[in-house]
């Protein structure tokens, strides 16, 4: 168990979030957003998309737009768009982390951005921050994690929570709690590859939804385990690499 006086891995990750975001990174995020929208629109017209639309017709209504024309509450919108975006997956794979960040981060950030009525720049900055955390957590998990777990979901939930925390302007303490609550919800096993169905899409959508919930809970004051990434009973027990070998502070 790490000392309570030692910054947790989560806190170290969040310390990086204060760095200025370059315009070229915002432009790259905007390009990924356009590509992701294309994937979502295409997925809407598939069998899986039709099933998601049928579910959305009975989901809790709200102010957040979803592809298909439904206006849902924030969490439901993240689930709907996050699932749709995974049907024809955007190829933004980070090979080292084995994560497709857009599947979870775009859907979560879009939902919260609509609810909070943030600026386009704030949205893109949140996406960049979410991408970084999802990728770094994926690198921590390593490729062995991917053998049994769907890394886009299990690691992407941390990125989704980070993006939402950025949009809500949470401080480091609150954002640490957001990532803690995200880790408590991390899920997604690869049995969905062994059988037909739409469970892979559910995993990405659910992680987007969980990212929204994690940030909202943290904003409300719900504390969580600071050492969710490296503690004795941490999320993703397969995290075996010493932190120094991950070179956390390198870009």
Give the location of each predicted region.
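N-terminal core-entry segment
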Residues: 2-249
């Amino acid at each position: 168990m790490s000392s309570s006086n030692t910054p947790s891995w989560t806190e170290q990750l969040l310390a990086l979030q204060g760095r200025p975001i370059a315009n070229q990174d915002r432009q790259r995020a905007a390009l990924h957003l356009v590509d992701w929208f294309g994937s979502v629109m295409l997925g809407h017209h598939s069998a899986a998309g039709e099933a998601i639309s049928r579910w959305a017709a009975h989901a809790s209504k709200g102010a957040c737009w979803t592809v298909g024309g439904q206006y849902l509450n924030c969490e439901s919108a993240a689930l709907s768009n996050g699932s749709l975006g995974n049907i024809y997956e955007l190829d933004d794979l980070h090979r080292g982390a084995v994560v497709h960040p857009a599947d979870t981060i775009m859907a979560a950030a879009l939902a919260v951005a609509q609810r909070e009525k943030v600026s386009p720049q704030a949205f893109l900055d949140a996406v960049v921050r979410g991408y970084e955390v999802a990728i770094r957590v994926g690198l921590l998990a390593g490729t062995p994690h991917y053998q049994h777990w769907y890394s886009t979901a299990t690691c992407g939930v941390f990125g989704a929570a980070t993006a939402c925390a950025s949009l809500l302007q949470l401080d480091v303490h609150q954002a640490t709690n957001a990532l803690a609550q995200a880790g408590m919800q991390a899920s997604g096993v690869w049995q969905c590859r062994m059988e037909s169905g739409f469970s892979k899409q559910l995993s990405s959508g659910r992680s987007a939804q969980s990212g929204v919930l994690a940030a909202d809970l943290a904003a409300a004051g719900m504390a969580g385990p600071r050492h969710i990434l490296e503690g004795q009973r941490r999320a993703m027990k397969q995290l075996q690499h010493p932190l120094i070998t991950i070179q956390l502070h390198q870009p």
